[in-house]
Amino acid sequence: MKRPKLKKASKRMTCHKRYKIQKKVREHHRKLRKEAKKRGHKKPKKDPGVPNSAPFKEALLREAELRKQQLEELKQQQKLDRQKEQERKRKLEISPDDEQSNVETQEESDEPKIKKAKSGKQNPKKLHCQELKKVIEASDIVLEVLDARDPLGCRCPQVEEAVIQSGCKKLVLVLNKSDLVPKENLENWLTYLNKELPTVVFKASTNLKNRKKTFKIKKKVVPFQSKLCCGKEALWKLLGGFQQSCGKGVQVGVVGFPNVGKSSIINSLKQERICSVGVSMGLTRSMQIVPLDKQITIIDSPCFIISPCNSPAALALRSPASIEVLRPLEAASAILSQADSQQVVLKYTVPGYKDSLDFFTKLAQRRGLHQKGGSPNVESAAKLLWSEWTGASLGYYCHPPASWNHSPHFNENITAIMKRGFNLEELEKNNAHSIQVLKGPHLTNKILFRSSGLTNGILEEKDIPEESPKQTEDQQDGDDQEHVTGEKNAEISDVTPVEETREMSPGQSTASKPSDRSFILDKMSEEDDAYDFTTDYI
């Protein structure tokens, strides 16, 4: 029976019913055991493989490996043939009117047809660039969100140049995740960045929930109160003062590299979880317009696309697909090479290490990351370090450059134009108050990191490389040329035998599946009966 005011029914029942169910279950299990006992337990026969006493063992193994490889390639070829046959049948099932239109388009040219098919699945990086350009064009103020742990590495000169060239637009820097760096370091960075652009110290709230909570009994709406947010008032006053000086509505675009906290800043300003946030990089894939009040509208944007010409450490920290493009060991080693080794040892509580591989081995032993045989899983340890450094919990910091110089795309006139219309004195007071309120990281959670400088990004679609996994798959599926199949068949027939030999014990097997190996050995005996093992070797 369903209880009132509750969604789930009660699991209560009478003892008679419960004992009856238990009795039926016992009887069912007894019958299963009885049937299994009648059938008996037959152990699968193990294939002993090629004995060590057999002559030409290495040649047999090579031929078996070669035949297995040829069978796999043949299966792949048959799969491609089936797909092409299905495509041909689909084309035949099209109505006559559609056939006439298809014939006319095919007679014009084949190349435009291929281009149209490819345009249906566009590269997601190009879509990011398109959405980012839309945000910059629609914005009056562009907030470039920087990670306070590496502010210089989060600046993109290409995007800043686009904002400067687009006309009378303002560029403001927001130092997010300010609670993860020491206060002295944060003050030094604030002084360094304020010389060029207005900078706001910010710490986004991480305890946001859904927009509203409703209760059926009271029929009252309870708005959500955000917690642990610093710098919200300073940013509100900065945007509000600029809006009053303009005398019209203002649109604010939020841009930055992945995982710097763009969507978290919007949620903190709105005090609601409107934009999707998470640990994984690149969750925002299209622009999202959020009205803050009647006069100020904020626009969320997808992340910058990092250029492949950057340093390996920058690629590992700023690229969402760095683990896919780079190997985990390479990405984590690039990060580790830029960090202070003594502080890394204190943070991860491992003994001193010689190189990155030695560190990952000790870290895997420390965290209990082992492979099947008990050896340390170095790759899992590298992924663990990469996820911590790209997340929002590890506190590392960089020192600002010793000498200050204008960025290549800035000068004194541009700096004066960018600061015009903002109350910088009030902003300085609010930043000082925010730094005072913030709690710095723990001593063991501070790691000195050597920044690699400005990170180059890609804003133009033509600069994005055309090759991508999705496009290559589409090309393989859509390729209907007959000479490709001939080439593949020729490759299968002309495969050279494997030169490497394997040393095996009498009990070991050569292939992963026993059924495959038995088939291969039987096949060999049918093909070559010139040598008789039973008569010559007893």
UniProtKB/Swiss-Prot annotation:
Region spans: Basic: 2-46
PROSITE patterns attached to this UniProt entry: G_CP
Linked residues for Glycyl lysine isopeptide (Lys-Gly) (interchain with G-Cter in SUMO2): K91, K177, K248, K262, K270
Primary localization: nucleus
Modification Phosphoserine, positions: S95, S101, S493, S505, S518
Region feature (Intermediate): 277-451
Function: May be required to maintain the proliferative capacity of stem cells. Stabilizes MDM2 by preventing its ubiquitination, and hence proteasomal degradation.
Listed name of the protein: Guanine nucleotide-binding protein-like 3
Gene that produces this protein: Gnl3
